Regions:
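Signature of N-terminal electron-transfer/Fe-S-associated modules in redox systems
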Residues: 1-185
Length: 185
């Protein structure tokens, strides 16, 4: 097994890694860097749970071998787009629309939608559906309406038409029962 030294920028941090060129990008992210938000469902590029952003493009990392990742690539994963105190508009919209029933597909959908909104800041419902079809993002729990609704609302936030707070539930009596915890990836 011949190892390969790579320079990558992952979630804004420059990294020097020694990788097996035959390993998938998903394996390297999950096993070497412990970025487990990149989910591996099918290992065949069919479900989209492993979608990350590579040099500005949504890619299915479970089928991308490290030998095909260019040196000095810029990689974004779900861990790099928001913080517990400052979530990305897509993450807020995902919560607001109840998009994460089991949550397994959410990181892949969010990363895919992030690229969509960078390329098209005002997509139609049909453009969003088509994007998810072309990029093979699948969800077996929610159906797709809440996912499309979330992308529409996140786009409004990113265009400045809404604030993130506008998407969140406000109880009428100003009381929420229970405790809020940051959800791990």
């Amino acid at each position: 097994m011949k190892m390969k030294k790579m320079h990558l920028i992952i979630n804004g941090v420059q990294r020097i890694l020694v990788v097996d060129p035959d390993k998938s990008l998903a394996s390297v992210l999950r096993e070497q860097l412990l970025l487990t938000g990149c989910k591996v469902g099918c290992e065949a590029g069919q479900c989209g749970a492993c979608t990350i952003v590579l040099n500005g493009k949504a890619v299915r990392s479970c089928i991308l071998k490290m030998s095909r990742v260019p040196d000095f690539s810029v990689i974004e994963t779900i861990e790099g787009i928001g913080t517990p105190d400052d979530l990305h508009p897509l993450q807020v919209a995902w919560m607001a629309h109840g998009c994460a029933q089991c949550g397994f597909c959410s990181p892949g959908f969010i990363m895919s939608a992030k690229v969509l909104l960078e390329e098209n800041p005002d997509p139609t419902r049909e453009e969003i559906r088509r994007w998810f079809q072309v990029h093979r993002n699948l969800c077996r729990c929610t159906g797709y309406k809440p996912l499309v609704d979330a992308v529409i609302d996140a786009a409004k936030v990113m265009r400045g038409e809404l604030k993130k707070e506008d998407l969140l539930f406000e109880p009428k009596d100003n009381k929420i029962i229970g405790t809020t915890y940051a959800r791990p990836s």
